[in-house]
Amino acid sequence: LHSLGMVDLQSGVCRKDELPEVLAGLNGEFIHSRGRSTELQLRYPDALSDPGNIVVTRLDTRIVSALVIKRFTWRVPPLDLRAAMIGMVWTHPTMRGKGLARTTLTHAQSMMATEKLDFAVLWTSQPHVYSSLGWVSADLGCYAAGPGKPASQPATEAWPEGFDRMLCIRERLSP
């Protein structure tokens, strides 16, 4: 029995036979509900062609939550930092508000800790939901053309407070 009162709630890596169900949920949420047409597996084939990149939470035999992990190496000579980007966090619409995305993310965090990754980036529009799991906002801004306007105040330092944590990783791993 899970603390949510649901029998047989399990998180783990997506199985190959579950991939169509997961893709249907992700595409429904992030593509079709927004009036888009190019499905995620065509936009992100490297991440979504391997079920090993997808973490799911199952209730009995049904997928109720999922997220995608894209592992990468961040080269900061002389270092090669092992890292991951996490995105496409999804919970079935009828199951929202029960902590299932948190359950899925907690399992993903355990997996990444076992892999001894140096850091991970969580892409979310709701950072407050995940702060209790140890995630901190480290948004460095947007790199894109945009409408310009005069600054309302003098320029300030570009790095947020959390960037010091990233520098600590670099110092710890430097030879």
Predicted features and spans:
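Short, positively charged and aromatic/hydrophobic N-terminal segments
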Residues: 2-3
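Short coil/turn motifs at secondary-structure junctions
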Residues: 72-74, 94, 127
